[in-house]
């Protein structure tokens, strides 16, 4: 599972996801890509599930790039705990994804295989996505 090695602060505010992604919205490394169409928090488990699905489907050959990284800690309070007494402890990590962000890139495989691999990875994501081909 992906997570930062160290951070300056253990806990973060939730924040809000306004607008579209201006960074990381172009294909940089591969030939085919998966692009987010909705804003969401994508957990490190979901990122890993998508990555595994793609590598398993592309089988031999092909290179895969994961373009998002979970750098936001999400805190959870223990069950049946009364309100107050501070913020909960960090439970898991999420990547804040805005519309337009490239999630995965792949190259070195035929388009048919890339489409299949990316569609399987897309089904693991909690948002609507689209398949892109670099010009």
Curated annotation (Swiss-Prot):
Endpoints of the signal sequence: none
Disulfide bonds: none
CDD domains: Ribosomal_L16_L10e
GO biological process: mitochondrial translation
Pfam family, one: Ribosomal_L16
Keywords: Chloroplast, Plastid, Ribonucleoprotein, Ribosomal protein
GO molecular function annotations of the record: rRNA binding; structural constituent of ribosome
Subcellular location: Plastid, Chloroplast
Keyword Phosphoprotein part of the UniProt annotation: no
PROSITE patterns from the UniProt entry: RIBOSOMAL_L16_1 (PS00586), RIBOSOMAL_L16_2 (PS00701)
A cellular component annotation (GO) from this entry: chloroplast
Subunit structure: Part of the 50S ribosomal subunit.
The family this protein is said to belong to: Belongs to the universal ribosomal protein uL16 family.
Name of this protein: Large ribosomal subunit protein uL16c
Organism field: Fagopyrum esculentum subsp. ancestrale (Wild buckwheat)
């Amino acid at each position: 599972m992906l997570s930062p090695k160290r951070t300056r602060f253990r806990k973060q505010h939730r924040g809000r996801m306004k607008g579209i992604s201006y960074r990381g919205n172009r294909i940089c490394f591969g030939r085919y890509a998966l692009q987010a169409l909705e804003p969401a928090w994508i957990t490190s488990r979901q990122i890993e599930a998508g990555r595994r699905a793609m590598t398993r489907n592309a089988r031999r050959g092909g290179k895969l790039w994961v373009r998002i990284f979970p750098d936001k800690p999400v805190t959870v309070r223990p069950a049946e705990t009364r309100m107050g007494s501070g913020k909960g402890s960090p439970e898991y990590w999420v990547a804040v994804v805005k519309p337009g962000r490239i999630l995965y890139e792949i190259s070195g495989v035929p388009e048919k295989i890339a489409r299949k691999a990316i569609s399987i990875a897309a089904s693991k994501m909690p948002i609507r996505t689209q398949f892109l081909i670099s010009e």
